[in-house]
From Swiss-Prot:
Record's subunit section: Homodimer. Part of the ribosomal stalk of the 50S ribosomal subunit. Forms a multimeric L10(L12)X complex, where L10 forms an elongated spine to which 2 to 4 L12 dimers bind in a sequential fashion. Binds GTP-bound translation factors.
UniProt record similarity statement: Belongs to the bacterial ribosomal protein bL12 family.
Gene3D superfamilies: 3.30.1390.10, Single helix bin (1.20.5.710)
HAMAP family noted in UniProt: Ribosomal_bL12 (MF_00368)
Cited function: Forms part of the ribosomal stalk which helps the ribosome interact with GTP-bound translation factors. Is thus essential for accurate translation.
Gene giving rise to this polypeptide: rplL
Name recorded for this polypeptide: Large ribosomal subunit protein bL12
Entry GO MF terms: mRNA binding; structural constituent of ribosome
GO CC aspect terms: cytosolic large ribosomal subunit
CDD domains in UniProt: Ribosomal_L7_L12
Length: 125
C-alpha cells in the first residue's frame, strides 16, 4: 500500500509542537536544507547593503504578555525551553521574561509564531 500526500499531511497535522520541531530538525539534517524563510530583496541598494551588514543572526525571545490562554502558553513555553511547570508558569505570569537567548532567527520566529497563536505577546530582540 502506497502512502499518499494526504496520509503524510494527516500524520504531520496530528504531531505535537515538540514532535514537529524534532521532525523539522531531522529534515534539515537529512536533506541539508534550512527551514528559514527566504529573504526577498528590496529597498535602495546602499540601504540594503548597510542593513545586510548589520542584520542580526541571534535573537532573544522575550515574552511581554502571557495573554488570556495562560495554560496553552505555559505548555508552549515548557516545550520550547524545557522548563518545569512552576518555572514556565512563573515566566508566563511575571512578564516581561526572557525565554531563550541567542537563538537562530528561524527558531526565534517559529517560537514567536507559536506563542502568538496561543494569545501571548512576544518580542524578538
Amino acid at each position: 500500500m502506497a502512502i499518499s500526500k494526504e496520509d503524510v499531511l494527516e500524520y504531520i497535522s496530528n504531531l505535537s509542537v515538540l514532535e514537529l520541531s524534532e521532525l523539522v530538525k531531522e529534515f534539515e539534517e537529512k536533506f541539508g536544507v534550512s527551514a528559514a524563510p527566504v529573504m526577498v530583496a528590496g529597498g535602495a541598494a546602499a540601504g540594503g547593503a548597510a542593513a545586510a551588514a548589520e542584520e542580526k543572526t541571534e535573537f532573544d525571545i522575550v515574552l511581554t504578555d502571557g495573554g488570556a490562554k495562560k495554560i496553552e502558553v505555559i505548555k508552549i513555553v515548557r516545550a520550547l525551553t524545557g522548563l518545569g511547570l512552576k518555572e514556565a508558569k512563573d515566566a508566563v505570569e511575571q512578564t516581561p521574561s526572557t525565554l531563550k537567548e541567542g537563538v537562530a532567527k528561524a527558531e526565534a520566529e517559529e517560537a514567536k509564531k507559536q506563542l502568538e497563536e496561543a494569545g501571548a505577546k512576544v518580542e524578538l530582540k
